[in-house]
A protein has these predicted regions:
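Glycine-centered recognition micro-motifs in short, flexible terminal segments and loops
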Residues: 1-2
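Long, compositionally biased, intrinsically disordered regions
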Residues: 5-215
Length: 215
């Protein structure tokens, strides 16, 4: 009778433990899904502010991005990477990026994870910006995510490229940011008309400094 009772007790304990682990795995799985959505939102917010900061930096120093002597001494891609991650360009702190860098957002996510007994670590392998459509830029973050339950019930290692698109309409055309003493800032606005349809349309297009896509 004692042996039977022990076996039954052990069986129940094992079952309870397995159910607890299963619940924990489901909880972590839901957390990971929510976290991935938060990462995409963070990329959009940080990416948008990074583009504005790049404009501000150009206007402040009145130069284009590049490594030639007459340029800013940093390429556009490297400047974007730096400001996106750290909130600086050429080590100059950009005010728009205060509490809005990607590192800041991932640290906040790790803090939230810790409250639910999850150890969350991020490794940013690369940050790139490219233009694949006339009115959009793509922000791609190559990320490694390591999520581990504090009791070692479950763990995830995720290697993933996260990409968000940002519409560039409304941003200032970079060509107008340099060598004009801040007198002319032409924003990118998609033309609502066909400028080639008539002389009147062409005049309207030119007077309003509209933009037309060109592939």
């Amino acid at each position: 009778v004692l042996i039977l009772s022990y076996n039954v007790y052990t069986g129940y304990r094992l079952k309870d433990k397995m159910e607890a682990v299963e619940i924990r795995v489901d909880t972590m799985s839901s957390f990971i899904k929510d976290m991935e959505n938060d990462i995409e939102k963070a990329i959009f917010i940080v990416g948008f502010r990074s583009l504005l900061s790049l404009e501000d930096y150009m206007m402040k120093y009145d130069k284009f991005y590049g490594i030639d002597p007459e340029d800013l001494g940093i390429t556009f891609n490297n400047a974007f990477d730096e400001v996106f991650r750290q909130g600086t360009i050429n080590s100059v702190t950009m005010s728009l990026m205060k509490n809005n860098t990607f590192v800041y957002w991932t640290n906040k996510m790790s803090e939230q994870a810790n409250k639910t007994n999850i150890i969350l670590n991020f490794t940013v392998n690369s940050v790139t910006i490219s233009q694949t459509e006339p009115w959009m830029v793509d922000i791609k973050v190559d990320l490694r995510i390591n999520a581990t339950d504090k009791k070692n019930a479950a763990s995830w290692i995720i290697d993933k490229d996260f990409t968000k698109k940002i519409n560039i309409t409304g941003f200032v055309d970079p060509l107008y940011l340099v060598n004009n003493d801040g007198k002319v800032n032409n924003t990118i606005r998609k033309t609502p008309i066909n400028p080639s349809a008539s002389t009147s349309n062409l005049e309207t297009h030119m007077v309003n400094s509209y933009y037309i896509e060109h592939n």
